[in-house]
Amino acid sequence: AKELHFATDAPRAVFLIRQVGHSDVATVDVLAGMFPDKMQDFVLSINESDVAVIKQITGGTTPEDLEKIAKSMEDTLKNELRIKTVIGIGTVSDHLRELADSYKEAQTAIDVGKVFDTEKSIIDYENLGIGRLIYQLPTTLCEIFLSEVFKKNSIDSLDQETLFTINKFFENNLNVSETSRKLFVH
């Protein structure tokens, strides 16, 4: 870091941009054009679908500010290259040695978001909540829990009206009041 003349203890955010569907090699160039300061911001090609952006930020940068940066990257790639992306944001690292952890967190954010929040294209590691905890559980423990909660043939024992109500509940994004309006329940 000393030989390259950049600060080791500056706050930085890691954004992992994953291209969904088709990938474009020009993604790195487009992102590098968005962050031209090569001494503070770094754009790294990880593999054919992933690009990491390490952005130096100020001390007062909020999670909302990070989401705005991610949104601008998403919009630029969508408009210029017609690429659909999912962006994971790691926690802010205050030192160079913490960047690897932040990168892993950005990866985890994408993986957890793929399972628990498929609608979002920008996922912040700090906002994963209980999904992060569940994601880290061993598969066998999840299978045991599911087999205890959902007994064999339990869905078969439900009548048609109950199944209809459950389907409406999911169609209305788990919104009880909207479901009751649709079912005329008062």
For every predicted segment, state its role.
Residues 2-186:
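Cytosolic nucleotide-utilizing catalytic cores of signal-transduction proteins
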